[in-house]
Amino acid sequence: MNNTIQNSTITDDLKYVMTLDKLTEYLSCLICLPGALCNAILIYLIWKRTPIQMRSYAIYILNFALFDFATCIISFFSCQQVIFSDFSLVYIFHGPCKYVSPWFCYFCHCFMCHALAHSQWILLGSFIYRYRVLTGETPTAKDLIRNSVALYSMSLCFLLVYVFDNSDSDLLFQILTRVHPEYHYDDESIWKKSIVVSGNISAFAPITLISILYMTIPCVPIYCAILYFRHNTRVILNNPHINLSPTAKSNHVKLIRALTVQAGIPIFWLVASGIFTMSQFGIIGGPIPENITFRLMDCIPLISPIVTIIFVQPYREGLLKVLLKNSGLFVPNIIGSSIVDQTVAVTSVFGPKVTAFVQTQL
């Protein structure tokens, strides 16, 4: 009789939840492992294929690649799922970290969050850099290093504070089973294994609340600022007084396209933050928001290096040369029409820096 009831419970109430949990594990592998590979390739291209005129801007790109690589690896090891339990934040970890300890899983969660936050600040910095170059300023490598350190200091402080805010795992598990008895997490005969949990007892505890605000609130002003600098950059590039050759004009269009694509990357962060906030306050709920929040954020470090390799000419050509090197195919020094005509003359109020900017970006 008990077995019949248990099988009925699994079939009717838990099969869907268990399927989504398993899908989350598969998605983590499908997103994080290719993301780590793409970022490793980008790091290699930055090291080997960065031209002299791009060395300052490459500091920001290297920031992206290093932190996105770390995010992919750490997220794969944690593969967290957030269960909103009243005002407690309970994370269930499906990744390999569960074989170490709940605290290590929580550290992975904190590290991933701080790395993602830093990447968003650097993305904003890269848009500001492009705008400054087009308006006649010349940020040096030292300037960008100082900016990177200043931006990272915020995320580092977040990590150092948040990592010591974890609550007792046994108490969190009790809260989880009390608030969500329908999941039967305390029944190992159903789940076949013990559930590894960590998190925060109260989302309104000072440190936890500050950490949540840092991860959710800045994404809105950051995205607005990105759109602002993207708009101003497009205005400059569309200035009719900038005289470009046909090849340069073609690359000018590609640059605007690249800016549009890159400006869309934070949308994943915005959507994930919105889902997190609405779930925390009970506006939405269920296994889909619980599983999808961090998988959406995992998409950011996967897409970012792909966009960079596609739209930054030296890295795109460098990768193609590596791929074609041993194929027996002819490898030209200049691939297609992606390189800007080096003899183009630009006469405008913005000077030749506009030409150099377009040449190194596309």
Curated annotation (Swiss-Prot):
Pfam families: 7TM_GPCR_Srd. The chain crosses the membrane at residues 27-47, 57-77, 104-124, 144-164, 209-229, 264-284, 292-312. GO terms for cellular component: membrane. It is found in: Membrane. Keywords: Membrane, Receptor, Transmembrane, Transmembrane helix. It is a multi-pass membrane protein. Thought to be a chemosensory receptor. Belongs to the nematode receptor-like protein srd family. This is Serpentine receptor class delta-2. The gene is srd-2.
